[in-house]
A protein has these predicted regions:
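Short, glycine/charge-rich beta-strand/loop segments that flank catalytic centers
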Residues: 46-51, 110-128
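Conserved small/polar residues in nucleotide/adenosyl-binding loops
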Residues: 193-200
Length: 200
């Protein structure tokens, strides 16, 4: 029953949150140290634990066939712990990907910018990783000792990509019921080309 499913998810989420009250700080500290030790210069590492209302809304999503997108939400939603790494230049992204690949088990790696280009659209660049903390991860990063087996999501962006994403979200897509005009779309497309060139 859907109610039992959501009740179970609520118990799982709140039990985990109570057991790991410093999760956001633990992951931020561990990843900052990881990048520093690897010699990667970064702007910032930000972390957040997904709120219960946000998790509940995601767990209720259904596909076109009416089935739940996440039948087992606690096991299938991987951004309860979310990490964002902001780098100064795009050339550092492959280095960061290598460091994460060596330090965690990589469940999924997606280049969002490449996906957008392949589909013929436009959008900000961002690389998304789904990672799992292993015994080796915890041995190297003592802050993560309590999270062995835990899966989390990492977004890697440059400072420019991050600024673009925030700007586009606030100006282009938060327009209420009125869609942006063709002039606005053309302006954003031109700005995107300019920002891509600058990031290279």
């Amino acid at each position: 029953m859907p109610e039992n499913r959501m009740s179970r998810l609520s118990n799982q989420y709140h039990d985990w949150a109570r057991s790991h009250p410093t999760a956001a700080v633990d992951f931020r500290t561990a990843i900052e140290d990881l990048l520093n030790d690897a010699g990667i210069i970064f702007d910032r590492v930000s972390t957040r634990v997904k709120t219960w209302p946000s998790l509940k809304a995601k767990a209720k999503k259904r596909g076109e066939n009416g089935d739940f997108v996440y039948p087992q939400p606690w096991d299938e939603i991987h951004d309860v712990m979310g990490v964002r790494v902001t780098l100064y230049h795009s050339t550092a992204i492959p280095e960061a990907l290598d460091v994460f690949g060596e330090s965690f088990k990589v469940e999924r790696s997606v280049d969002k910018a490449a996906e957008t280009r392949i589909s013929g659209g436009f959008g900000y660049g961002s690389h998304h990783l789904v990672l799992t903390v292993t015994e080796d991860s915890a041995a190297a990063m003592e802050e993560l000792a309590a999270y062995v087996g835990w899966t989390f999501e990492v977004q890697i962006r440059t400072v420019l990509q991050h600024a673009w994403a925030e700007f586009e979200h606030d100006i282009r897509y938060k327009q209420g019921p009125n869609p942006p005009s063709p002039e606005v779309d053309r302006l954003f497309t031109c700005l995107l080309y300019t920002s891509d060139a600058a990031d290279e």
